[in-house]
Amino acid sequence: MPPGVRQLTVLGKFKPFGLIAEATDGKSPDDSYQYFLFDPELTGERDDADGNDANFSRQREHELFIRDNCNVRKGYALVEANFIGYWYNACWSNLGRGTEAFLCVLQIACLTIYNTSGEVVSVPLMRTVKSIWPLPCGLLLEQAGEVNPPSHVPFSPVSPILGSREMLRQRKEVGNSSPQNFHSPVAHDLISKRDMPCMSSHLILRDPLEEPGPTYVEERGKLTIMKDYDERTIWTSDRLPLMTSYNKGKMQHSVWAAEFIESNLEASASCSSGIVPDAVLSKRVSFRRIWQAKGAKKAASKVFLATDNSVPVICFLILEQKKLLSVGLQTVEINNEILFDVKPDISWSVSAIAAAPVVVTRSQVKIGLLPHLDIIVLSPENDLFLYSGKQCLCRYVLPSWLGESIGSGDGESAKTDSGFRNLKITGLSDAVLGSINLSVNHSQIFRCALTGKPSSSLANDCIAAIAEGLRSDLYSLFLSLLWGDGHSDLQGSSIHFEWEALCNIFLEICQKPTVVHRKQPKTASESSWEFLLISKFHKTYSRFHNGITSINRLDLEGIVPFDSKICSEETLGSSCELMVQSLDCLHAVYESLKMDNLRKQDLHHLAVLLCNIAKFLDEKCYLDYYIRDFPRLSTTIGACTTLSSSRKPPNLFRWLENCLRRGCLSTNFDDLPDLIRRDGCSIVSWARKVVSFYSVLFGDKPEGRTLSSGVPCNIAPGSYSCNEELTILAMAGERFGLHQLDLLPSGVSLPLRHALDSCRESPPADWPAIAYVLLGREDMALSVFRNFSSSKEFEMQSNTSLISMSIPYMLHLHPVIVPSSESIGLENTKIEDTNSVDGSVIDGMEHIFNSYTQLRYGRDLRLNEVRRLLCSARPVVVQTAANPTISDQEQQQAFTVPKLVLAGRLPSQQNAIVNLDPNIRNIQELKTWPEFHNAVAAGLRLAPLQGKVSRTWIRYNKPGEPNAVHAGLLFGLGLQGYLHVLNLSDIYQYFTQDHESTTVGLMLGLAASYRGTMQPDIAKALFFHVPARYQASYTEFEIPTLLQSAALVSVGMLFEGSAHQQTMQLLLGEIGRRSAGDNVLEREGYAVSAGFSLGLVALGRGGDALGSMDSLVNRLLLYLGAKEERSILVPSLEDHRSAAQITDGSTSNVDITAPGAIIALTLMYLKTESEVIFSKLSIPQTHYDLECVRPDFIMLRVIARNLIMWSRICPTCDWIQSQVPEVVKNGISQLRDDMDNMYEVDVEALVQAYVNIVAGACISLGLRFAGTRDGNARDLLNSYALYLLNEIKPLSATPGNAFPRGISKFVDRGTLEMCLYLIIISLSVVMAGSGDLQVFRLLRFLRSRNSADGHANYGTQMAVSLATGFLFLGGGMRTFSTNNGSLAMLLITLYPRLPSGPNDNRCHLQAFRHLYVLATEARWLQTIDVDSGLPVYAPLEVTVKETKLYSETKFCEITPCILPERAILKRICVCGPRYWPQQIELVFGLRTLGESNLIANSHRELDSDSVDHLVSTFSSDPSLIAFAQLCCDKSWNNSFDFLILDLILWSQVALAYNEAVSTGRLASSGGFVQSIFLASLRKRCEEVLNCSTELKINLRNYLTSEAWPYDKNSKLQKDIIILSWYLKWFNVPSPSIIKAAVEKIKSKSKNSTSAIPLLRLLLPNTHISVIGEIDRVFFPSN
């Protein structure tokens, strides 16, 4: 019969979406536009809509619309991309980067490349490129010829593979439907004549940032640069490395295969000759010609890929001959490389004037990287045909109403109306998947959908399974029957009709075998030439001469529709074979549907069809198998007519049960359908996944992408130690989530749930997030998710993946994505301050009140107290003397703590406000540094919340007049690393303002942002402020010493750790010199800054074998006052004109140079344990030495010695006392109140040395245990702080005899105060971020002291505020690190010289006090309950590694908490009965704990005797409560008898699971399902099955006559149902198998002994009670 006729689904008149969008925007229409449609999968944006549903046609395709040479609009989201200049060519390409797509636009002298995220790269072109073409290995650029290049450039027809590319067309009118090539004027050639021989005619671009490389051609085993400009490219594939070209001179088409060449030698030497040596540059692309054909006068108008019997073919549309020629391809895999060649036996042609590839018949199937592509062909007679390879499937026609609607719309005459009704299709275009544009003969274009995939999921599954399982010739027969159906024009009208139509195909074969037309043999009258053409010799020989002209018309006669009216024996045999293989394919679908609880109705429909097929084929076992599942079919389906035994049907449930009982390797794989074990078969992938999970769970091992048993399985990456863990990885790899697990029958899912339960408690730490979601461990899933999420795209993909693995109806109870803890804050928290004047004032500390601090401190008011103490937005309480006669001016002068609000509050005078007199002469100078410090704090608070600070934001906040506030803000932003957004012009604009504070803040901020980078531009800007770096010819600049000091430290931070020789020599000279100014008071501060900088440059590098390190150290020792026999001074790099050597006579002024030299040596030899330097920095051991060395220098030496000998620092009182020399110990021990016989000078020197040594040791202790919260260090430092506090003013009882008493009589109070506050700061450094209450009470006491209680000044108040801030660092969320860089920053911050006033920068620049920020790190840990998304308390067990002071230690913490330093952190475990245990190992790879939250998941157990109460704990839904009452009521037992029978099949697997657990084949999970429950389930089922009195009679009749009970009058047909349940429960074989076993026993055994042992041997899986019944039926005499 002729091919089936199907009606096209017309979606409407076609109009580019770009025009629709422009019309919406109100733009006037214009014809100068171009567009093409493509599949969104090309750019990774494939929609989830049904690929063949006409309603979603326009949603599943994207459009590239270009207008006015400047604008691109992609898709339906209107993503615009602008480019400048005229464009010639555009296409999508992945540039050899996998799935990432790039839009490549060819312009006059450049190639513009856009990615999907909006980034643009422009690639300059040195020669004229006339077209670009996509290849899997990159973008192919075809260059113009050397002489007289063409005046116009064709467009690359973008390959319509997947419908992704259709040629861009210039639309002169809407009705112009045929593709046209575009031409454009060519710019002048940019390449010179001498370079022309080395140029290739085709270039390949693989990276937008690289230059295009030449391509090569392989000829006779040699590689030659491709320079044939006559080979014009006409098509390339973006999926397969194929290119087609046309040579006009030779009238020849060629097909080329692109291949990579790997080698290491250059090819430039051979450019002149054009011959490439044996090895060329790595990753070059060569082309190998695999097919050629001559005879075509013009190039093929269209080339595309299609498939024919699962083989890719290249199709050429030759318009001059009106033919579509197809050439088959074959692939060969050699050394993991795929090589392409032409398959000689696949070459055919059909008549056509237009053609395009479409996805219609097998949309779910892929042939390698390609989808299954059919061909839509427009014949010369304007008929539209659908081909699957060379087989014509159907003819498509336009609906009749289409012409009527067009004619009626125009309102013309009847004659015109009749013309409209006779519509003819004149052209095809814009094919995307199953949609295409059809041009008709009235200048109209319609978008049409080609219906192929049925709407019925069951029909679609069956057709797809048949396509996968049938042999190619049988599948062609099936297609002819399917598409040749006379009712196919009604396809899609009803889901039920689609299924009935499919069933009718098989039923017609069953009733009347269909015969297929075959090619008639040639008669004797045919010529010898025609006989030769049909011979096998011609088919073989034509491979080498296969051209377009070699196709004889006689060969086309074989490409005709099948005819079902002609019968033959061969056709009858094909029909039977079709039915046999179809039975196997459909049975595989049947077994897969049995694994899905939601497709019971489809299972019944399929069983009816399978029963008819099995009956037709006399497959009695199959027929009996289906009737057992659906017993009522026995009344409608008769028995088989033959008595011969038939095949045993595969039984997936039997395989699962045997797998549970005996293991995977002992099962019979004949129980699995062949399709399930086949790789790439997506139709039965549901059953394949279940089989693979069971296989892995019971001993099968992965071997690549398959298991050792041959079952395909994708396994997610991760470690495993047992089969259960491997099963979880397999489920994660197959994306088999909890929702899919719910769809499985309960008994089948039971072993998989057992595996989940076994691994839930302690899964490995390297699993993917989806594996943890499977386990219900969303806590671990989110930890993994947040550790690896680096972009919003990744976050959305991960969210989608995690949600897909979860249970939809449980997402509101167990969310897998929770909000960040930062968003769970206390927005309305207000400060509670009884002494505040205005509670609503903003003080900049609102951010410290969040969920973390609330959880950590609870209702504790310490944070409120911290906020009150550090508040700078309110007047400060001023304690006044009791004498009321003191003037206001004196009270104002007593105010020594400068803050933003320079006002005081007098509680004794009814909280009167006292403002600072604005007439004070230096009022602005007094406010400068307080405003600077306050702005730094604001910058530190602002930057983390801002997330990203832009250059524009900084410039907009720049004041009109420079001030200290903006200077401090710049410094604060720089400490957070945000000043790298400034460019050089911004930096020099700040410098030209000539404002000291701004310059200081900017230099230090830039150095912090570019710390350790040695960035040349920043270094140049900093060295500008160091006059010693100037050359002799430079004009002298008057740079304040303050700026020079800041510049020196900034240089040190910029060059940190580099040991840059030139910079170190410069800084060494600066320690011994003063600045260009004459401010003698600031010389020490300048030298200290140079020492800081030198130490930073050579940080920890003192032990390196550097050439000039010895001389540098010797000179530093000279600055310390060491005695040297010879001069080792290193000459300066510059002239001494701008600085003079600081000397006192013939030696250096040690009072100036010693601090800087000590600091430099300390940082250079930090943690190096250098005994040499340690001995050089000795402590005075005699009275004479004590009088010669300043006491504060002794403190610096103690700090230096301890930081060098890092490992010797110990938090004990004995260690601190060991720092004190014997002469000092002896002198201090003899102190008495009545000592009159000791020299006063001697005693004062001893006490001064003692106090400074103790303070230095405490500072060393604070740095050694910075941020550790070490209890011993805290107690020790606290005791020394209380000791000095009692010496200043006795407040408590004597702490004991451990400390000497009465030292305050021999030392000034200022020294004691300074040492006290240095110890206090050290104590806060140890307890940084902890908020320790004991330390805070001490700080609050010190903060409340006035001048009457102690030496209260600017420096001491700064120390207390600094210590308070350290104690609550980052609101308790940050702490200090002890790496070299952090210690250096802390040492600079804690330099033991406190300022005496707001403007005191003589010895230490106040801005350096903020460098502690660079020593902080976030080590806080917070736990979030994944069920509620709220922070919770969780107990942790923290394990730290063994150190020199401690062995490996475990301790407990309650979150939120601060973890130990990551260098010593080994393991973190979540413990306690409330949460699932979780263990994080940090030995081999440190995870960034500061950037992720550790999530805790609670598993609460609710015990209740009341069902109502139990349900009410999680739901108040009345329907759910009623359902629980019904199921748990005792009267439900009667109904249970019927419900349990539906679960008989699944219960068998559940019982096998129970056996696997009891025998140890599955690891016990602690009572996941109680074995007594399963045993009671077995007993109850057997009681139900044995209660029927008629069962034995029906069973006897079934065994003897294979007859099912006939109970037509009974509505429920109870006897049939009970018999089927009995047969399945006791594994009764089919009667044919039983009879075969009986006959075998009777033939072998002649005696009258019992046949039960032999029956047991032949029927091993059958229950013993059934075997006894068989014995009684067939052996009654026994």
Swiss-Prot record:
Pathway(s) of this molecule: Protein modification; protein ubiquitination
UniProt-listed Pfam families: ANAPC1 (PF12859), APC1_3rd (PF21282), APC1_C (PF18122), Apc1_MidN (PF20518)
Keywords: Cell cycle, Cell division, Mitosis, Nucleus, Repeat, Ubl conjugation pathway
Localization: Nucleus
Stored InterPro entries: Apc1, Apc1_3rd, APC1_C, Apc1_MidN, Apc1_N, ARM-like
Superkingdom of origin: Eukaryota
GO cellular component: anaphase-promoting complex
GO biological process terms on file: anaphase-promoting complex-dependent catabolic process; cell division; embryo development ending in seed dormancy; embryo sac development; metaphase/anaphase transition of mitotic cell cycle; plant ovule development; protein K11-linked ubiquitination
Disulfide bonds listed in the record: none
Similarity field: Belongs to the APC1 family.
Subunit relationships: The APC/C is composed of at least 10 subunits.
Protein name: Anaphase-promoting complex subunit 1
Organism: Arabidopsis thaliana (Mouse-ear cress)
